[in-house]
């Protein structure tokens, strides 16, 4: 969950954090706080926008076991980030996840586009998003895919063609694609 603002969302987040049978991907710092207070391991999702090794170290110290790299950053940036983590002595304390395929998350909104399109309040949406498992496509006047609106998230209108794969090889991340 990103942009937690409604009381119902905070209640749901607390309920998820109280379940220690699953590992939570935190996409809002409030989830990091709840999980670290409970001493539960967690994943820092791409929506937290972590861009430097010092911040990663703080999250590792709070219980992070995996970090999802922000989708807008490059291979070279990732290599530099991981080298910085090696210098801080934390690289072996977490896994790295890289988004390689799918609609790219571009922005989050306080309003739920899906609920609004059906004239429903965000807190009383009756899970209308389940009718649209792939989101709602928006097109340009020329009929080209522009965005996919999926709940509170605006995503890219098409899936990038290239898929870049990284692997860990003798302590270094290398490009394999």
Feature-to-residue mapping (PLM):
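Conserved glycine-bearing catalytic or ligand-binding loops at nucleotide- and phosphate-handling centers
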Residues: 66
């Amino acid at each position: 969950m990103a942009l937690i603002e409604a009381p119902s969302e905070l209640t749901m987040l607390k309920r998820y954090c109280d379940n220690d049978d699953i590992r939570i991907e935190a996409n809002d710092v409030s989830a990091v706080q709840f999980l670290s207070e409970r001493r539960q391991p967690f994943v820092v999702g791409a929506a937290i926008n972590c861009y430097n090794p010092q911040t990663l170290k703080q999250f590792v110290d709070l219980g992070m076991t995996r970090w999802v790299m922000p989708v807008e950053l490059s291979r070279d940036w990732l290599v530099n980030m991981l080298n910085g983590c090696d210098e801080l002595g934390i690289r072996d304390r977490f896994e790295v996840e890289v988004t390689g395929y799918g609609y790219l998350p571009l922005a989050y909104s306080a309003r739920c586009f899906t609920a609004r399109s059906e004239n429903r309040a965000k807190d009383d949406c009756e899970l209308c998003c389940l009718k649209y498992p792939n989101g709602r496509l928006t097109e340009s006047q020329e009929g080209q895919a522009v965005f996919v609106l999926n709940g509170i998230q605006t995503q890219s209108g098409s899936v990038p063609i290239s898929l870049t794969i990284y692997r860990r090889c003798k302590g270094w991340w290398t490009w394999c694609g």
